[in-house]
Design a protein with these regions (language model features):
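Exported/periplasmic ABC-transporter solute-binding proteins
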Residues: 24-275
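Bacterial N-terminal signal peptides that target proteins for export
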Residues: 2-12
């Protein structure tokens, strides 16, 4: 039998190890679920990551509630939990998880592109949701009925606008206000319903291909620099929660999110990166 040199055997073993590592990288799947409000930004990041890493597998779920997402992460059913509010960072950390803040995004009053006003005052917002202003022509726009939309009271976008707009804090919405259960429901309704207005995020606006536009509030646009300087006050945080020591595939995705390339994706999708 022919003898094999130690160097040849070592090279063969190294080649096999490298092939195994590549195979593992192409088959490891990162499972992400949680806040549907954060999902559009994470979906954009996942698309960009896959373009750079064609073998990467990232699965984004259809949404989990505040407690359910952390429980799923703790039980190993998901690798990353998306969150925007209701997150007790100290408690999550105590349970052996790590919270990564990836961005801050403006909560906006988005309108269907057919609506013509570019700005609302806080008083006008409240009068719309109270049912006292019902046509855009009353605000200098076209003769088009206003279709007011809102998210459930437990959702972060509603929490933000009620907390930051004084006249909304205790306002009872008119019967005409339609409640959109999930963030994608709001995005679809704004894009497809003439005259509609509703609270959403700048990420949704940026991803709408011009079908949804964001209104300024009291003359202040929800622009990147205004979110950074906090002159635009309606904002919410975007968090990713992982195990304290995430699996290698998850760690690689997080590294991309924190990279210059990841930050460019965050900015392009209407959010402000947070290191």
């Amino acid at each position: 039998m022919q003898n094999r040199s130690p160097m040849r055997v070592s090279a063969c073993l190294l080649g096999l190890a490298f092939a195994a590592a590549v195979a593992a990288q192409t088959t490891e799947k990162v499972v992400i679920d949680g806040s549907t409000g954060v999902a559009p930004l994470v979906e954009a990041l996942a698309r960009a990551y896959r373009e750079q890493n064609p073998g990467a597998a990232i699965e984004i779920g259809k949404g989990l509630g505040t407690k359910a997402r952390i429980q799923a992460l703790r039980e190993g059913r998901i690798d990353v939990a998306m969150a925007s509010h209701g997150l007790n960072i100290a408690e999550v950390t105590r349970q052996g998880m790590t919270v990564h803040e990836i961005g801050k995004v403006a909560v906006v009053f988005g309108v269907n592109a057919e609506a013509t006003p570019g700005n609302l005052t806080e008083s006008q917002v409240c009068r719309i949701y109270a049912g006292k202003i019902t046509n855009w022509k009353e605000l200098g726009g076209s003769d088009l009925a206003i279709v007011p939309l809102a998210r459930p009271e437990s959702e972060v976008d509603t929490e933000v606008v009620r907390a930051q707009i004084g006249c909304l804090q205790k306002l009872e919405f008119a019967d005409a206000v339609k409640i959109m259960p999930k963030a994608p429901d709001m995005a679809r309704a704004l894009a497809s319903t003439p005259g509609s207005v509703g609270m959403t995020s700048m990420t949704v606006v940026e991803q709408s291909n011009g079908r949804v536009k964001a209104l300024s509030l009291e003359g202040i646009a929800p622009a990147h620099e205004n979110v950074q300087t906090r002159s635009y006050r309606l904002t919410r945080d975007s968090f990713l929660v992982t195990a304290a020591t995430p699996a290698s595939a998850t760690a690689r995705f997080l590294a991309f999110v924190r990279s210059v390339a990841g930050e460019k994706v965050i900015v392009a999708n209407g959010a402000v990166p947070v290191r």
